[in-house]
Amino acid sequence: MLLLGRLWSIAALAALTVAAPSRSVPRDVSADVLGQLTLFSQWAAASYCTNNSNSTGDGVSCEQGNCPLVESADTTTLYEFDETSSYGDVAGFLAVDKTNKLLVVSFRGSRTLSNWIANINFGFTDASSICSGCEAHGGFLEAWEAVAADLTSKIKAAKATYSGYTLVVTGHSYGGALATLGGIVLRNGGYEPSVYTYGQPRVGNKALAQYITDQGSLWRVTHTDDLVPKVPPATVGFSHASPEYWITSGDNTTVTSSDIDVIVGVGSKSGNAGTLNPDTAAHNWYLGHIDACK
């Protein structure tokens, strides 16, 4: 596991060859947006907690106490999954939140060797079935496809039962990559999800990033100089969608609206990409200790 982490560190250092220590003109977020980013960071955090992936029908909870907004709502998991025998060991859940009238899909970030194998399998694969000229990270796309059919079926049933509820897809790190790719496919299928990701790596080429940007309804959150959003490197053709919500405050601090800069532009070299000292600790703190259950 340490070796795999070092491979990602090497990739991030390669990314720094094109990064510039620049920063766009800050545009703070509203209190409402901050509230949404905070809420869905806690939904992403819940995916790391094992009680949310092995007991369908229970309320969503976090044994480390890092998802109080979720725990205070009227929630029930409708489908929990941990595909240990499938490529990428994708884990997470689909839940209903009757308090906020939400259907939430939350993908777990990296925990197992299979997760890391999917992470470092970053050769491009054809994604023209998603959009013209698009190429995706091979490992992430294959991992999404391992759960796509069953999960989409469960979402379809949930949408029929909970008419008028908003569909949200979220995840941190590897889970954020799956949320992004899954979100594109679900939008193409007419489901119209909002996607919130935290510390996600790049998932495809510039054409894919532009397509995601044009679809809209993406809140891609980064934190200071977090290592993971810097990989796979832009030098080999990977790109991020826009906009980026860049948290500029440090670890273990309360984030305010003025601590988040909105960075606009596909493949921008500002925000997280403009920082020069990749930090693994920054990856764990997204409006709270997001992977405390890991």
Question: Where are the regions a protein language model picked out?
Answer:
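Fungal secretory targeting signals
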Residues: 1-24
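Non-catalytic, mobile gating and regulatory segments of ester bond hydrolases
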Residues: 18-170, 174-294
